[in-house]
Regions:
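A short acidic/small-residue loop/turn micro-motif
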Residues: 122-124, 277-280
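Non-catalytic linker/capping segments at the edges of enzyme domains
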Residues: 1-43, 103, 118-188, 289-309
Length: 309
């Protein structure tokens, strides 16, 4: 989750034309890169987070998809996103990309100024990783409290026909979601779309950072490793992260690093993420009225005690 918002506008439904059926179709149409490394970017409203801007994890997923034109494959890979500036929806922008060996880099530009870039590195991940899953990465036996839903966010928008329509929960230990992805996020053979991991884990990371720092904010560095993108995942999945793993990046505590994972129903680790969250009162000023209006007062006081009065 990244960028700015307006609480009044956030509930406004998109008036854009109906989006295609699957997230793969939408993203392929939004980010078109030619084999010469040049292309165009035009994201529909269905890919937004806060009103008017593209979802942060969605941006990484879009640039991963665009990198296919440069020869980037569908196997295990690491996605490294640098969200320098918010990227507007329904605005024609430029794409530039290049590839060298197993690494492809794609950048979104506005009047030659970079807004966001992502690197797709297939050489950074082994084909059959054996990374251990922390015992605390589970939704089993957890109840917790619900997160507020939005209307049109790609991840948590209750009225976004394309979106995950995600209901995150939290407790004293961390943040999680346990659900079966909708048909628009699935492909043949019970495979989940590769866009799901960056979108979902970015959302988990935002809440991990916000609930540890007790402030609103944004994510600006997104690293997601797709460990088993070709695996069949027929049942529900779990996305989870722990507050204990949220740590300051710098001495001034301006940036905080989060850690989260995506697991199949049998506990198989599908993806891991290391995502940087930047909190601040300037973000809270714009975001808290939205959350307060959509959250039970007692729950809101637990989440953001400094803004509960």
């Amino acid at each position: 989750m990244t960028g700015d918002m307006n609480a009044r506008e956030y509930s406004t439904r998109s008036h854009a034309r109906r989006t295609p059926e699957t997230v793969a179709h939408v993203m392929a149409a939004a980010a078109r890169l030619g084999p010469d490394g040049r292309g165009r970017f035009l994201a529909p409203a269905a890919l937004q987070s806060w009103p008017g801007i593209v979802h942060g994890g969605g941006l990484v997923a879009l640039l991963d998809a665009a990198a296919r034109a440069l020869g980037s494959g569908d196997g295990p890979r690491r996605l490294e996103g640098r969200l320098t500036s918010s990227v507007p929806i329904e605005t024609a922008l430029d794409l530039e990309g290049h590839a060298e060996r197993d690494v492809a880099t794609v950048t979104i530009l506005e009047r030659a100024q970079p807004l966001t870039s992502a690197t797709v590195d297939a050489g950074a991940v082994e084909a059959d990783p054996a990374e251990a899953v922390p015992a605390e990465w589970t939704a089993a036996g957890r109840e917790g409290w619900p997160m507020p839903l939005s209307d049109q966010c790609l991840a948590c928008g209750a009225h976004n026909a394309l979106g995950l329509q995600l209901g995150l929960r939290w407790d004293r230990d961390g943040v999680w979601a346990h659900f079966r992805p909708r048909a628009s996020w699935r492909g043949p053979g019970d495979r989940i779309d590769p866009a799901l991991a960056p979108v979902l884990l970015d959302e988990v990371a935002w809440w991990l950072g916000a609930l540890v720092t007790k402030e609103g904010g944004l994510t600006n560095r997104i690293s997601v490793t797709l460990l088993r993108p070709d695996a069949a995942v027929p049942g529900p999945i779990t996305a989870v992260g722990r507050f204990a793993d949220v740590t300051p990046v710098d001495r001034r505590r301006i940036f905080w690093r989060t850690r989260s994972g995506l697991l199949a129903a049998d506990g198989t680790l599908l993806a891991v993420a290391s995502i940087v969250f930047r909190p601040g009162a300037e973000y809270s000023t714009r975001q808290m009225s939205f959350f307060r209006a959509r959250t039970d007062p007692e729950n809101f006081a637990r989440m953001f005690p400094g803004y509960a009065g």
